[in-house]
Amino acid sequence: MKTLNKILEGKGIAIIRGYHTEDAVKIARALKKGGVTLLEVTLNSPDALRTIRELSNESGMTVGAGTVLDGAAAQGAIEAGAKFILSPTLKVETIRTAKRYGVVSIPGAYTPSEILTAFEEGADIIKVFPATALGPSFIKDMQGPLPQVRLLPTGGVTVENAATFLEAGAVGVGLGSSLVHKTECVDDAFLDEIEMKAKRFRELAMMRGVRT
């Protein structure tokens, strides 16, 4: 299955930020056990490219890079195995680099003008960031003038409120600290908690009539 289709079907991208590779792999496996297999490794994490390489070799996971700020960073992440590129802001060179290498481009945008620019430059999905500042109503309102644009709200989206964004028309959500918060102790209890939260996300999405 193509990466874009996996994202559209999976609905939730788990953001792994600030962890060294060994702990990131443990977290990713817990997420997979909970049913979340779309993983974003942020480039401001320790050993981020190594983590992307390691997770790209894990069966059943689709790994992308986040906090990608320019074309050079995008290229490095892609060479490490990233299948999609996420950015917090709109930078055309990052979109173009992703497209050049045939990976999914998900730039950040905050206004209708930025969203349209990203779409016209070839972005596959637009990351609406920070999402909670705009709310689900913004996602719904954008369906009128720009129904062809795929939106993925991120930033303040939680396991509990994700379904409201999906119901409003988002093709997926980015799940950060509400799913994987930062801790110094990645022990069995922490991993069990992540697995439980991942399962909860899928259950809530299904209960609210959103296919996962």
Give names to the regions the model predicted.
Residues 1-83, 100, 160, 184, ...:
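Conserved N-terminal beta1-alpha1 strand-loop-helix module at the mouth
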Residues 35, 59, 81, 89, ...:
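Conserved functional loop/turn residues at catalytic and ligand-binding sites
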Residues 70-80, 113-121, 138, 157-173:
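Catalytic cores of alpha/beta
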Residues 88-94, 128-136, 168-191, 197:
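Glycine-rich phosphate-binding active-site loops on the catalytic face of alpha/beta enzymes
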